[in-house]
Amino acid sequence: MILAVKTRERTELIDVTSEISQLVQKSGIDQGLCMVYVPHTTAAVTINESADPSVKSDMLMVLNQIVPWEANYRHLEGNSQAHVKSTLVGPSQLIAIEKGRLVLGTWQGIFFCEFDGPRNRKLHVRIMEEHFVQ
């Protein structure tokens, strides 16, 4: 399954937990795994606190401190920092499914991380059922 994600800012975190949870519920799978993958070199996916929006701001602030917009980058397309940030955050997450629901902590959410927007992006979701061997 592919989720379309339309980003509006150059750098932003978008909570996609609800959309992914709906896909898991529609799958009818009781127990298994949900893999979320970003097929872009300037975007990523992460799991972090979703209750307090200031956490998203803090994450972006720290990433901008670690990887500044302007530096002596050799890649001349103007988005080198986006490539580095996406590498640090990572392109995928694997979440357990139990009783038909994603296993996330009380405050956890799944975030699409845009580092070179705005753009139309894709988020691949694979839902795999667990089979027990006897």
Role assignments for model-derived ranges:
Residues 1-134:
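Active-site histidine-anchored catalytic micro-motif
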